[in-house]
């Protein structure tokens, strides 16, 4: 699920790829997911951050006013698209850094029944 507390959410704001409806109508933070889980009798057992470079790629593309399905979109052109090879390398590096730091835009949560009391 998208992580609204992430670096990508803060950096890209309204251009953040995860805000692109209808894929995600609600976005959470790790804390809001813990609260929601607790309210419904679950506990968060594990949180993993597993963003892919495309999150930054498409967020940056939106910032540059290039729609997802535009002819020059990365979605249609891949490495021959709107970004230099050096930019794509940096997006990959930044994604690895954010995942390792727990500050990435995508999180995977494992929930278990019970509060663990």
Question: What do the predicted segments below correspond to?
Answer:
Residues 2-26, 31-38, 60-62:
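Short, glycine-/aromatic-enriched active-site segment of Class I SAM-dependent methyltransferases
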Residues 31, 41, 113-117:
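Short loop segments at secondary-structure junctions
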Residues 12, 27, 43, 50-51, ...:
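Conserved acidic-Pro-Pro-aromatic motif
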Residues 48-117:
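A C-terminal cap/extension of S-adenosyl-L-methionine-dependent methyltransferases
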Residues 38-45:
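Secondary-structure transition into beta-strands, especially the periplasmic turns and strand N-termini
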Residues 1-2, 50:
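Alpha/beta-hydrolase-fold catalytic nucleophile elbow
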């Amino acid at each position: 699920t998208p992580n609204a507390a992430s670096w990508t959410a803060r950096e890209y704001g309204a251009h953040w790829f995860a805000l692109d409806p209808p894929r995600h109508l609600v976005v959470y933070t790790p804390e809001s997911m813990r609260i929601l889980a607790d309210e419904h009798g679950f506990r968060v057992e594990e949180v993993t951050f597993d963003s892919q470079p495309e999150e930054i790629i498409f967020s940056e593309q939106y910032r540059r006013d290039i729609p997802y399905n535009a002819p020059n979109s990365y979605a249609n052109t891949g490495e021959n698209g709107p970004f230099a090879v050096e930019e794509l390398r940096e997006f990959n590096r930044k994604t690895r850094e954010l995942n390792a730091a727990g500050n990435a835009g995508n999180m995977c949560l494992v929930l278990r029944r019970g509060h663990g009391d």
